[in-house]
Amino acid sequence: MSFKDRLFICCQYLLPHHLLSRLVGFAADCRATWFKDRLIAWFARRYQVDMREAQVEDLQAYEHFNAFFTRALKDGARPPAQEPGAVLCPADGAISQLGPIEHGRIFQAKGHSYSLAELLGGDAELAAPFMGGDFATVYLSPRDYHRVHMPLAGTLREMVYVPGRLFSVNRTTAENVPELFARNERVVCLFDTERGPMAVVLVGAMIVASIETVWAGLVTPPKRELKTFRYDEAARAPIHLEKGAELGRFKLGSTAIVLFGPQQVAFAQGLGAATPVRMGECLALPKQA
């Protein structure tokens, strides 16, 4: 590891993650025209954001930076995969890792893995249906579309807010911060689908101001304690989301992890670490019995 990388990792442990993220969140919600217009223009130029696919192409039309960052796309910008039974990629970005969940652990990077149960808030009962299953980790870069969508149609069963650190999420931290995704703040969403239980985990990162879901709105930051929300079939209005429907969004960041049970899916050919992906593309197909 280079000296620059060592210094970066050292700073990750020393920086006040949540304070820094709150300050960035305050700036991202600032509506002062002179400030937000300059910030949005700089960001779009710095990260070469393609505004031609956005519903609102005019950078100055956004009321604040967060509105720009979580911008909606034009209808048809992400057509869903047409393969029968296709499991859709939940977000734009790149595959960080994907593969089998082995011995209750998920591969993070060479020499590193993390606990499935810890990812889900330390609940062995929640983890049980995914033991021996499969996972896919999608990293969203700053230039990407930052809404997360349903890989399959599903009915929400449970949501868990898991407090944690806010390490940056990138290749350097994945290779050098043990249990990275099981240490960062995250929101776990569990669904019942035609392929059995499915979990979509929204993982926060440094300067990620908040995570939202379409049914609960702002989920982070509440009090920094683990909190579980249960949604059962006896509820007056069960929460059901169709395949491809928006699930949630990040305000600055970061990573979405999708979990499936054993023998349910086979990942699409050609997918591997660092493969660029777009929301709606074929992530996996049903595994044949």
UniProtKB/Swiss-Prot annotation:
How does this protein sit in the membrane? Answer: Peripheral membrane protein
**GO molecular-function term, one example from the UniProt record:** phosphatidylserine decarboxylase activity
Q: Does the keyword Membrane apply?
A: yes
One GO term describing the cellular component: plasma membrane
Coarse class of the protein's main subcellular location? membrane
**Which reaction(s) does its UniProt entry say it catalyses?**
a 1,2-diacyl-sn-glycero-3-phospho-L-serine + H(+) = a 1,2-diacyl-sn-glycero-3-phosphoethanolamine + CO2
Question: Where is the site labelled Cleavage (non-hydrolytic)?
Answer: G253, S254
* Cofactor note text: Binds 1 pyruvoyl group covalently per subunit.
Q: Where in the cell is it found?
A: Cell membrane
Q: Which residues form the active site?
A: D92 (charge relay system), H149 (charge relay system), S254 (charge relay system), S254 (schiff-base intermediate with substrate)
Function field:
Catalyzes the formation of phosphatidylethanolamine (PtdEtn) from phosphatidylserine (PtdSer).
- Describe its assembly: Heterodimer of a large membrane-associated beta subunit and a small pyruvoyl-containing alpha subunit.
Q: What is this protein called?
A: Phosphatidylserine decarboxylase proenzyme
- Lineage per the UniProt record: Bacteria, Pseudomonadati, Pseudomonadota, Gammaproteobacteria, Pseudomonadales
